[in-house]
């Protein structure tokens, strides 16, 4: 496969999946029922929680087993630091958007901050795959597929929430 086509696929597939999920808002009525919105938000949260636990937290605990302290401590410290960092970003965003952007502006900022590291990781995986090593190529494809599948319900939940916020 051409390197440019491969890199474009790895980078654009997650974005296309987000767009696909967000396009679901056009299939529903202008103002979705609260039940539909709760189901989609719950599904997106469940997928993100599962991805966090099984793809990040458990592998981090496994890698921590080589350290001289209990394996869960580095992961717990990282989890707490991440939560504190998120609270700091939340406070900063509140001050930044206090001028009237409201909930919609906060949501757009949150989605941007969330997708930035995803794009960076996909780009790094694509760059590593260009070395030609089979593990790097399959890893980049799997990462792109995993991020993309997570982005479908995420895009739906965000678009439905933005529609709900924007209407009186």
Segments predicted by a language model, with ranges:
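Alpha-helical transmembrane segments in multi-pass membrane proteins
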Residues: 9-17, 21, 25, 42, ...
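Helix-boundary and loop/linker segments of multi-pass membrane transporters
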Residues: 1, 97-101, 131-136
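Interfacial loop-to-helix junctions that mark the boundaries of transmembrane helices
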Residues: 2-9, 33-40, 63-76
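Generic transmembrane alpha-helix signature in multi-pass membrane proteins
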Residues: 24, 105-148, 152-162
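Membrane-interface helix termini and inter-helical loops of multi-pass transporters
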Residues: 57-68, 131-132
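Residue-level detector of conserved catalytic or cofactor/ligand-binding positions
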Residues: 163-168
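C-terminal ends of transmembrane helices
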Residues: 21-34, 86-98, 155-162
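Cytoplasmic-side transmembrane-helix entry/capping segments in multi-pass membrane proteins
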Residues: 35-44, 100-105
């Amino acid at each position: 496969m051409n390197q440019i086509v491969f890199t474009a696929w790895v980078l654009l597939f997650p974005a296309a999946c987000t767009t696909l999920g967000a396009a679901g808002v056009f299939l529903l009525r202008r103002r979705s029922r609260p039940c539909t919105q709760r189901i989609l938000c719950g599904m997106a949260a469940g997928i993100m929680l599962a991805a966090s636990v099984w793809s990040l937290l458990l592998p981090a605990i496994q890698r921590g087993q080589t350290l001289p302290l209990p394996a869960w401590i580095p992961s717990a410290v990282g989890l707490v630091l991440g939560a504190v960092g998120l609270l700091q970003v939340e406070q900063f965003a509140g001050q930044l958007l206090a001028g009237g952007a409201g909930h919609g502006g906060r949501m757009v900022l949150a989605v941007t901050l969330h997708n930035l590291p995803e794009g960076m990781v996909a780009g790094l995986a694509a760059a590593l795959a260009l070395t030609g090593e089979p593990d790097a190529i399959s890893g980049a494809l799997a990462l792109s597929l995993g991020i993309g599948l997570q982005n479908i319900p995420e895009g739906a939940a965000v678009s439905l929430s933005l529609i709900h916020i924007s209407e009186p």
